[in-house]
């Protein structure tokens, strides 16, 4: 199964979504499952990959993402797989988890390289999909929405050059 990865440009936006997942999304899943007469998917809480959590919690979250799967044994021992992963730019590098196959990017990242790196975290082992939710009140997001196709057909030419670290040793 999959984990919904939600990418945010700021911790402020992530905090709002965390509250939304903990309250409204859980309630919606319960109501929908009852209406459809099916078992509901249990969401304990959203996991985070951000600078707000400690290194120990980050390691636990990554371990949970990589090792815990849905099974009767895990449910019986109250070990639940991660359903929702809220992340900031920390997810852009070094995260290679097979169960990350669905991503929602809330807003356009400031850098094209960040957009490419973050969106490429899904679909590493199995096919994945990334959705982008633009904010109509932000002119930058609106511009990317209006030029979505042309931007994606040639976005590698928009990648900004990175600066060299001063006093670093030659490669």
Model-predicted regions and their roles:
Residues 2-85:
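Conserved C-terminal RecA-like helicase domain
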Residues 14-17, 56-58, 94-96, 112-114, ...:
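Switch/connector loops and helix/strand junctions flanking conserved nucleotide-binding motifs
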Residues 20-25, 65, 100-104, 119-122, ...:
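Short secondary-structure boundary/capping segments
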Residues 107-117:
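Conserved P-loop NTPase motor core
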